[in-house]
């Protein structure tokens, strides 16, 4: 049976029908949607509008539910109660008697009819639920006892509770229609719109399937239809018989129905052909149109040259004569067209005599051969809109130039004028929307059809799992915004996830090819019911089977180790007791033991699984994943899309699915745990008697908008990747060092080595820029080819930092080939493991992953064959150093005999046991025996081999680490020899990444935490990644789980406090006072000043609920406070004596931007100060604007050491609702982009007129005068600018005046040889320095941590940007001196102890000045004058900003921005952009010459204006 659709009026929902749906949903598929009326749609032809009819129909189609009783008598009783609830119980006058009757009938009954729930109960309960009088009695406990019992009994049931909560219709609770909830942040109303009188239209051309761009248009029109309780006309634009096809009309109607859009009227443009023709003849007779036979190409050229046609001045009679030829369709008539006579000299090309009618002799699908002339869309549209009563015509901004033509036609014909409302077209990356291009994909067989999930058609995206509700929420979030931007599909899918995540049931599926059995002997074969959704009990329960044998993912099994405790989801903790592998090292099965009493799931691996049981066999399933059809995000205008077609965009995986998958229906959306969301494209079919085969369940992956990798099977392996990388990178240094002949490496090898290194840089750069996959793959392929060539020529693997040596080897080297070969093979396995992990992490195609895994397994098998041991990560084969002298060969360098090797392995294994026990924080009773056994094994090893046991990873690194340690202590010049087991050994273990101490495993050291302290990206190479690392590693920012919101850590907040202290002090000197206004703004207040809030409209965040209760009216979270503060000003100002009012507040604001968030620079919540003043005169306000602007400049220049350009914003860029805006602009040379530092606005009287801030002017008694206002603001963006300008490749560089810590004191030279007395004296000296510096107001911190070396501390505080590092050691104390290291230059200064205070103060001031000077020089070299557009474009592309002659016109500025836009990103991850105006500098670089023209070449220049790319 086809799915039913219940439409519900949210203002008056039929609770009884909704309850019926809840009770029959197990038998019948019924979808519920919101609309303007209550009805049940059974098919296109059958619709029920009467509630009782709906109830009876639902009950009769779901016979097993028993809602309509079990016999004729019960049917009759139910009919009685249906009538009773609709009449007596709904009447105020008869309510008392009706309740008495109901109470009597329920005195001995649980249900009204029979012994089970029926329609009678649903209907009567729903009526009482919506009855205010009954609800009042219930609250006052005045209800009749049996009715109350019965009502409460039903209300407690899940279905009643669910419906009653979601569709609360109690009159004492105001509801908000859910459509309004979708309008989050979009309150732009239609001009002139009146409730109930709005008519909108959706006019598609019947020439193809609707795509997502059409869906936006349709849903926007529906939004205004519903919001204004108006009318939506669905009109087919069939003005072109060549394109119009009847088949597509049916297709489009189906697409509209899929979107749950219900038009009030269906029309065709062809319905009005006669009327349109009469209007055309009217224009001819009035001399406003003429017939032209100019060939098309010539006409196009004339329009471009603004040349009039030879027929433009024809007489009316001549035009009518030619018009008749057109109507006949004669050969001459076919060469003609009817043109409007408007203005051939217009700057708007659409006004240069556009075509109104053309001659086409093809038959029309609806009118046949009746007409030979057909109107153009541009002529027919305004006429039909007027005739059909359209009040508001919604059109995309690409039609903007045609709006003038639209209104000309309306005025020329003297007909009613609709209002055009513009919105932005939906542009999506990696997508083509052209019907011609989409048809090519279908014809080429690259897709399955027009409903292919890769297609942007309505049916395509719905088939891929997009929900109509998700699409509506996305469209509503965009609203009627006019900003034209290219959006990622991720945005849409993220909205969709919000809809499906709370309701999608959770199931399990395992990759069939890689499942591994797990034997759990003590498990019982049984079934339990668990929640389908862990957070939503309404989704219901599902059966989960348990058995002694279960299956898990092979990728998960690879991550396990024996003895590990693993959490099996929906079962509990299980211990892995044994891992069985085949000869190739592949895991074949696992043995496990239940540990269900252990409920600690915090540190365990969580995996999915399926039981082997005959009661519930796994269901075969195919998971299909789709990629973009187009590989390039944005295609250029002239680019051929066929060059960027992704020929491998569909991938399938065969899965073993949850037995519950057999019940899925087509279109059901589920989540496969740890894999993602899927939609059922084809339900499972059991074995067919015809084919003797079962049909698998086909599931299509639904993207969910995430950009970070999801946790998947084997995800634990990713956590191992990092240590493995370190092992492989350090491994070459531990292997045998071949003896090198005196001659240098050959020139050819060196050249090849350099080519490999250069190509490696190319690959890294492409990945950093997130280049197209095919570009990266090509570069990687070339890199691998070069590496293979290098190995062939040199006989060695390419290793970064290890250039080729000569091939000559001594005889002693050749005598030991096996150790080197083993090590080389070990390194190959490690590298191939990295390849496999990377492919899995990137979700590469299955074929690629399989090929890489097979290669890995063959390498492991080869390694085992050669060494006789399994490959173990972190345990490379023992190696011997190749020495030229025979004497050196005799020295033992590791285990040599079979017995020694076996003992070596036992020590290593026992070391692992000890480390694991300590990592798991096992009890001392367990750890001590393990350590004792380890020590005994080490003693045995020493007695057998004569040498101490040393882990392989520590070999050969002592010399290097000794140098490293000496370097760390160089301020003390500590060059004493150190014992083997002292510092160097310990550092060695860190550097190798193995977590082992130099003395072996388990000797009191335990596993050491590995940290990647320094920056791994360079500012000049990958600015975005560098910035991200700086703010996190320097402890400025902590990321938060709400996108666009960040935690300001003390290190960054202290900078804001410094700015706040300075600025607060200065504004108070001016007479400004601090205050605080609420964060919440009413909708009415926010909408008062349209021009002001228009820019903020898309960014406003709304509060719509309190708990689960919808608010009567949504409340905005302030994007700015003008509309909050100024009504209060109006109350406080009564006369001129109440002025001026000068208030400031330090607070947070929320602007829910859709752009890519960037900490400090573009965030959804940020801190700021906002000042708002009101004055009696214009001049007073103007003075304050400049005073505040100068304070902002001082914040940047005196505190942050950043030079700024002071100036005034252009008309386009000024503050919405203000008279003019002044600004300070900073420049970031690393990106070649400017950034707005702070603004100070003169608001004139705009807001005072809106909010009635008036006073009586003493000069003109009796007259009211509006106040003059200004506002000004500075945000935490300042911190981001400071980081970008001063930071370097070592981290932050903090200007001393805002640094949280200006000097950090670090003790050096603490070694084992240092006595306790000297150590304490050194600590005391450090604290003494701290006390002395605090005494002269220097912010200082002493780092006395004993678990970090001095070198580590140096790096740490350099990364955090501390201006000065003070190093002091025992020798410094004896010499009464210390070493000061400057962060800005790295310069080291030796300073006498007695001069500490004075010298450090001087250094700090010098650092502040140096930073400012350096940044000023940077700005000076990057800000130039350009007098032509060509020169300006070159300047922009070289990463500079320029002052150009400019006319100040908004259209001109838009043109400059469009002209200077470029295809390539300004920086990785940043959107492409054109230049925008930054400010009109108060002090330009040069004076404007008289007669100078704007760079556009059209208008005289008014001033030099600073333009550039900007954040």
From Swiss-Prot:
Residues 807-816 have a biased composition (Polar residues). The keyword Phosphoprotein applies. It is a peripheral membrane protein. Phosphorylated at Ser-998 by RPS6KB1; triggers EPRS1 release from the aminoacyl-tRNA synthetase multienzyme complex. In monocytes, the IFN-gamma-induced phosphorylation at Ser-998 releases EPRS1 from the aminoacyl-tRNA synthetase multienzyme complex, allowing its association with the GAIT complex. Phosphorylation at Ser-998 is specifically required for the RPL13A-mediated interaction of the GAIT complex with eIF4G. Phosphorylation at Ser-998 by RPS6KB1, is also induced by insulin through activation of the mTORC1 signaling pathway and promotes the interaction of EPRS1 with SLC27A1. Keywords: Acetylation, Aminoacyl-tRNA synthetase, ATP-binding, Cytoplasm, Ligase, Magnesium, Membrane, Metal-binding, Methylation, Multifunctional enzyme, Nucleotide-binding, Phosphoprotein, Protein biosynthesis, RNA-binding, Translation regulation, Zinc. It catalyses: tRNA(Glu) + L-glutamate + ATP = L-glutamyl-tRNA(Glu) + AMP + diphosphate; tRNA(Pro) + L-proline + ATP = L-prolyl-tRNA(Pro) + AMP + diphosphate. The modification N6-acetyllysine is found at residues 300, 417, 498, 535, 542, 637, 787, 860, 1502. Mg(2+) binds at residue 1236. PROSITE patterns: AA_TRNA_LIGASE_I, AA_TRNA_LIGASE_II, WHEP_TRS_1, WHEP_TRS_2. Residues 296-315, 708-741, 794-823, 868-903, 952-1015 are annotated as: Disordered. One of its GO terms (molecular function) is ATP binding. A motif ('HIGH' region) lies at residues 204-214. In the N-terminal section; belongs to the class-I aminoacyl-tRNA synthetase family. Glutamate--tRNA ligase type 2 subfamily. In the C-terminal section; belongs to the class-II aminoacyl-tRNA synthetase family. Homodimer. Part of the aminoacyl-tRNA synthetase multienzyme complex, also know as multisynthetase complex, that is composed of the tRNA ligases for Arg (RARS1), Asp (DARS1), Gln (QARS1), Ile (IARS1), Leu (LARS1), Lys (KARS1), Met (MARS1) the bifunctional ligase for Glu and Pro (EPRS1) and the auxiliary subunits AIMP1/p43, AIMP2/p38 and EEF1E1/p18. Forms a linear complex that contains MARS1, EEF1E1, EPRS1 and AIMP2 that is at the core of the multisubunit complex. Interacts with TARS3. Interacts with DUS2L. Component of the GAIT complex which is composed of EPRS1, RPL13A and GAPDH. Multifunctional protein which primarily functions within the aminoacyl-tRNA synthetase multienzyme complex, also known as multisynthetase complex. Within the complex it catalyzes the attachment of both L-glutamate and L-proline to their cognate tRNAs in a two-step reaction where the amino acid is first activated by ATP to form a covalent intermediate with AMP. Subsequently, the activated amino acid is transferred to the acceptor end of the cognate tRNA to form L-glutamyl-tRNA(Glu) and L-prolyl-tRNA(Pro). This is Bifunctional glutamate/proline--tRNA ligase. It comes from Cricetulus griseus (Chinese hamster). The gene is EPRS1.
């Amino acid at each position: 049976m086809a799915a039913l659709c219940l439409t519900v009026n949210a203002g008056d929902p039929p609770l009884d029908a909704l309850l019926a749906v809840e009770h029959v949903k197990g038998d019948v598929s019924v979808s519920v949607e919101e609309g303007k009326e209550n009805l049940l749609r059974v098919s296109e032809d059958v619709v029920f509008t009467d509630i009782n009819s709906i109830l009876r129909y639902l009950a009769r189609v779901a016979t097993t539910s028993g809602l309509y009783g079990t016999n004729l008598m019960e049917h009759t009783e139910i009919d009685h109660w249906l009538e009773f609830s609709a009449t007596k119980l709904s009447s105020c006058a008869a309510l008392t008697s009706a309740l008495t009757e109901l109470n009597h009938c329920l005195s001995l009954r649980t249900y009204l009819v029979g012994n089970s729930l029926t329609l009678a109960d649903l209907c009567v309960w729903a009526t009482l639920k919506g009855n205010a009088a009954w609800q009042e009695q219930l609250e006052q406990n005045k209800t009749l006892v049996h009715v109350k019992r019965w009502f409460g009994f039903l209300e407690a049931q899940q279905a009643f509770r669910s419906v009653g909560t979601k569709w609360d219709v109690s009159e004492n609770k105001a509801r908000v229609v859910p459509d309004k909830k979708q309008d989050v942040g979009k309150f732009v109303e239609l001009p002139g719109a009146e409730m109930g009188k709005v008519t909108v239209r959706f006019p598609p051309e019947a020439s193809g399937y609707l795509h997502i761009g059409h869906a936006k248009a349709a849903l926007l029109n529906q939004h205004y239809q519903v919001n204004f309780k108006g009318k939506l006309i669905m009109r087919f634009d069939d003005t072109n018989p060549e394109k119009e096809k009847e088949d597509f009309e049916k297709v489009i109607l189906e697409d509209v129905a899929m979107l749950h859009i219900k038009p009030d009227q269906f029309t065709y443009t062809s319905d009005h052909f006669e009327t349109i023709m009469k209007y055309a003849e009217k224009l001819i007779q009035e001399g406003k149109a003429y017939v032209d036979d100019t060939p098309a190409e010539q006409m196009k050229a004339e329009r471009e040259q603004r040349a009039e046609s030879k027929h433009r001045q024809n007489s009316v009679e001549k035009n009518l004569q030619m018009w008749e030829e057109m109507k006949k369709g004669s050969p001459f008539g076919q060469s003609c067209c009817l043109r409007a006579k408007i203005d051939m000299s217009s700057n708007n090309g659409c006004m240069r005599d556009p075509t109104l009618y053309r001659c086409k002799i093809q038959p029309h699908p609806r009118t046949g051969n009746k007409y030979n002339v057909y109107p153009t869309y541009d002529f027919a549209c305004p006429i039909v809109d007027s005739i059909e009563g359209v009040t508001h015509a919604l059109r995309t901004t690409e039609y903007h130039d045609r709006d003038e033509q639209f209104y000309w036609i309306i005025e020329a014909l003297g007909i009613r004028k609709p209002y055009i409302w513009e919105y932005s077209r939906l542009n999506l990356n990696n997508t083509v929307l052209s019907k011609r291009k989409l048809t090519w994909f279908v014809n080429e067989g690259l897709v399955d059809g027009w409903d292919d999930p890769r297609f942007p058609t309505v049916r395509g995206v719905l088939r891929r799992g997009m929900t109509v509700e998700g699409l509506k929420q996305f469209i509503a979030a965009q609203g009627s915004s006019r900003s034209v931007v290219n959006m990622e599909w991720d945005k849409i899918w993220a909205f969709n996830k919000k809809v499906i995540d709370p309701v999608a049931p959770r199931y399990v599926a395992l990759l069939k090819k890689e499942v591994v059995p797990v034997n759990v002997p003590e498990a019982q074969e049984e079934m339990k019911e668990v929640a389908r959704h862990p957070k939503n009990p309404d989704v219901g329960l599902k059966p989960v089977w348990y058995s002694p044998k279960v299956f898990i993912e092979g990728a998960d099994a690879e991550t396990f180790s024996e003895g590990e405790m693993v959490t099996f989801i929906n079962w509990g903790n299980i211990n892995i007791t044994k891992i069985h592998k085949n000869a190739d090292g592949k895991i074949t099965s696992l043995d496990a033991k239940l540990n269900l009493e252990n409920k600690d799931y915090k540190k365990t691996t969580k995996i999915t699984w399926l039981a082997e049981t005959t009661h519930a066999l796994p269901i075969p399933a195919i998971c299909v994943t789709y990629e973009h059809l187009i590989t390039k995000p944005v295609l250029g205008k002239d680019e051929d899309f066929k060059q960027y077609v992704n020929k491998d965009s569909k991938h399938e995986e065969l899965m073993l699915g949850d037995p519950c998958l057999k019940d899925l229906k087509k279109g059901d959306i589920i989540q496969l745990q740890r894999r993602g969301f899927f939609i059922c494209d084809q339900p499972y079919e059991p074995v067919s008697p015809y084919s003797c085969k079962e049909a698998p369940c086909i599931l299509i992956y639904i993207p969910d908008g995430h950009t970070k990798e999801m946790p998947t099977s084997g995800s634990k392996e990713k956590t191992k990747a990092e240590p493995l990388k370190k092992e492989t990178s350090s491994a070459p240094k531990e292997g045998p060092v071949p003896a090198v002949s005196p001659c240098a490496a050959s020139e050819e090898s060196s050249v090849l080595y350099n080519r490999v290194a250069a190509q490696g840089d190319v690959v890294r750069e492409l990945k950093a820029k997130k280049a197209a996959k095919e570009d990266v793959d090509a570069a990687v392929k070339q890199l691998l080819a070069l590496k293979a060539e290098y190995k062939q020529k040199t006989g060695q693997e390419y290793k970064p930092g290890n250039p080729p040596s000569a091939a000559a080897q001594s005889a002693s080297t050749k005598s030991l080939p096996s150790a080197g070969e083993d090590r080389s093979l070990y390194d190959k396995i490690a590298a191939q493991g990295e390849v496999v992990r990377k492919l899995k992490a990137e979700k590469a195609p299955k074929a690629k992953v399989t090929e890489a895994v097979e290669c890995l397994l063959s390498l492991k098998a080869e390694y085992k064959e050669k060494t006789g041991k399994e490959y173990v990560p972190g345990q490379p084969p023992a190696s011997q150093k190749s020495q030229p002298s025979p004497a050196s060969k005799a020295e033992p360098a590791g285990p040599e005999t079979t017995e020694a090797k076996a003992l070596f392995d036992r020590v290593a294994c026992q070391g692992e046991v000890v480390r694991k026990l300590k990592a798991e924080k096992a009890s001392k009773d367990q750890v001590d025996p393990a350590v004792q056994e380890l020590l005994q094994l080490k003693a045995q090893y020493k007695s057998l081999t004569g040498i101490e046991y040393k882990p392989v990873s520590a070999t050969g690194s002592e010399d290097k680490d000794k140098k490293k340690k000496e370097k760390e202590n160089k301020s003390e010049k500590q060059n004493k020899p150190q014992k083997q087991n002292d510092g160097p050994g310990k550092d060695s273990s860190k550097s190798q990444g193995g977590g082992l101490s130099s003395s072996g495993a388990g000797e009191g050291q335990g596993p050491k935490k590995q940290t990647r302290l320094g920056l791994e990206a360079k500012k000049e190479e990958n600015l975005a990644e560098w910035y991200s690392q700086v703010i996190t590693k320097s402890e400025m920012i902590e990321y938060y789980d709400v996108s666009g919101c960040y935690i300001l850590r003390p290190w960054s907040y202290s900078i804001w406090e410094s700015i706040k202290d300075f600025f607060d002090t200065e504004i108070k000197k001016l007479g400004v006072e601090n205050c605080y206004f609420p964060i919440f703004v009413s909708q009415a207040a926010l909408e008062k000043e349209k021009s002001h809030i228009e820019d903020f409209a898309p960014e406003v965040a709304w509060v719509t609920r309190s708990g689960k209760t919808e608010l009567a009216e949504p409340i905005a979270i302030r994007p700015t406070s003008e509309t909050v503060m100024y009504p209060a000003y109006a109350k406080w100002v009564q006369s001129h004596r109440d002025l001026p009012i000068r208030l400031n507040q330090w607070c947070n604001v929320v602007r829910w931007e859709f752009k890519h968030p960037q900490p400090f620079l573009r965030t959804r919540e940020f801190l700021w100060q906002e000042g708002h003043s009101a004055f009696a005169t214009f001049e007073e306000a103007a003075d304050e604007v400049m005073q505040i602007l100068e304070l902002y400049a001082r914040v940047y220049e005196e505190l942050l050491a950043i030079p700024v350009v002071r100036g005034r914003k252009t008309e386009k860029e000024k503050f919405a609702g203000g008279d003019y805006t002044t600004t300070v602009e900073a420049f970031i040379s690393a990106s070649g982009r400017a950034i707005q530092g702070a603004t100070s606005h003169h608001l004139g009287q705009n807001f005072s007129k809106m909010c009635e801030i008036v006073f009586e002017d003493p000069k003109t008694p009796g007259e009211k005068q509006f106040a003059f206002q200004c506002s000004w603001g500075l945000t935490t963006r300042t911190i981001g600018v400071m980081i970008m300008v001063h930071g370097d490749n070592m981290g932050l560089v903090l200007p001393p005046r805002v640094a949280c810590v200006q000097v950090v004191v670090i003790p050096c030279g603490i070694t084992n040889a240092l006595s306790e007395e000297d150590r304490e004296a050194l600590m005391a000296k450090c604290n003494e320095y701290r006390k002395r510096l605090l005494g002269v107001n220097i912010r200082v911190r002493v780092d006395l941590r004993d678990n970090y070396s001095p070198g580590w501390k140096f790096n740490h505080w350099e990364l955090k940007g501390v201006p000065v590092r003070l190093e002091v050691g025992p020798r410094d104390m004896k010499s009464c001196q210390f070493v000061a290291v400057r962060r800005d230059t790295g310069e080291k200064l030796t300073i006498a102890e007695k001069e500490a205070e004075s010298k450090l103060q001087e250094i700090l001031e010098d650092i502040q000045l140096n930073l400012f000077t350096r940044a000023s020089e940077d700005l000076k070299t990057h800000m130039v004058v350009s007098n032509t557009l060509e020169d300006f474009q070159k300047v922009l592309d070289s990463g500079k900003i320029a002052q150009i002659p400019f006319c100040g016109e908004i259209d001109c500025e838009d043109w400059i921005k469009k002209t200077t836009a470029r295809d390539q990103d300004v920086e990785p991850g940043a959107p492409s952009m054109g230049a925008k105006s930054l400010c009109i500098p108060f002090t330009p670089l040069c004076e404007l010459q008289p007669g100078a023209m704007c760079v556009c070449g059209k208008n005289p220049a008014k001033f030099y204006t600073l333009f550039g790319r900007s954040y």
